[in-house]
UniProtKB/Swiss-Prot annotation:
It comes from the Bacteria. Belongs to the nicotinamide ribonucleoside (NR) uptake permease (TC 4.B.1) family. This is Nicotinamide riboside transporter PnuC. It is a multi-pass membrane protein. GO terms for molecular function: nicotinamide riboside transmembrane transporter activity. One of its GO terms (cellular component) is plasma membrane. It comes from Salmonella typhimurium (strain LT2 / SGSC1412 / ATCC 700720). The keyword Transferase does not apply. Beta-nicotinamide D-riboside binds at residues 188, 192. Required for nicotinamide riboside transport across the inner membrane. It is found in: Cell inner membrane. Residues 1-21, 69-71, 128-157, 207-239 are cytoplasmic. Residues 43-48, 90-109, 178-183 are periplasmic.
Amino acid sequence: MDFFSTHNILIHIPIGAGGYDLSWIEAVGTIAGLLCIWLASLEKISNYFFGLVNVTLFAIIFFQIQLYASLLLQLFFFAANIYGWYAWSRQTKDNQAELKIRWLPLPKAMAWLAICVIAIGLMTRYIDPVFAVLTRVAVAIMQMLGLQVTMPVLQPDAFPFWDSCMMVLSIVAMILMTRKYVENWLLWVIINVISVVIFALQGVYAMSLEYLILTFIAVNGSRLWINSARERGSRALSR
């Protein structure tokens, strides 16, 4: 059976109601995601290779299960991984990494906070129509490319506020990571904790366990990057 098919099951995980069928593509994509976050916590540029594998495979998964809005968001994360790889690779004349781990200056931190609050508020109010528009855009693009896809039936979001938080904070965290700002890890901790709870409430315990592992990696990443920023003389909320 095709490796890229979500019906090619690697293992049945006997947890939750009815268990969870883990496909090969999801397993490889998940492992790539875990490696990406772990290597990023160690400030290794190679994290972006695994990040690209992760978003590519999950884009394929989202295509198969008709989550076209989520597929479209993977294009952003793909581009962000490409940019992050480039930004982290840049060197000074002394062959040192041009970007250093540091905290956001207070004005930038406040600006990002305002952006997050406003974006989460708007998304919470309009998440269903926003995802409907994103889905229509994705379907139109795929149809122009010759793919035989139709507009899926969309269900109202069960957790509009929390899903909005995860989407907005994930985008902001990815942007901050490409610029090596410590705050990206604090956001990932928040995102992962929310994900653990949401998936547990939905009975998808395998995904909840995955995000629990990601939470521990993000907490360790926060510790490592805070120490690294301190060694370079960078302080949180400094002007």
